[in-house]
Amino acid sequence: MSFESFLLFIMVFLLVVLVIFSVFNAIFFRKNKNKYDALLAEYCQQGLDLDLITKVAFHFGHLVDYQKILWFVLLYKGVKIKYTKERYVQPEAYQFVQSLPDEKIDWILKLHRLYLIHFAIMTLWFLDLFVLFVFYK
């Protein structure tokens, strides 16, 4: 097997893995959608800051599931987020998410880790594509 054939095989293999990961992540989010909706409703009832992307993400289906959970992941990890040019997200928003019981936040953190693995595999796929393009024009 030549190096070019090996790279093509890896490219196809990674593409199949990416499709499987995408389907699995979409199913995993859909399975927990009621938990997400309840968490979002509870969060909004508190009058806490919510970014525009999270507000409109439900219109785009599973294509933006990562964006739906990212807001809560960043708050859970305590990342300083600018809400407007003048101010950061309220400290109460961080406290709310960080004080959630494990059963409400663990699935979001797990899905976030799965998306990070997904993005790492996608990076490998693009790297493989780049090598094929550069060396085998």
Report the location of each language-model feature:
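Hydrophobic cores of alpha-helical transmembrane segments in multi-pass integral membrane proteins
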Residues: 14-19, 120-128
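Conserved binding-pocket/active-site segment within a compact domain
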Residues: 27-28, 39, 137
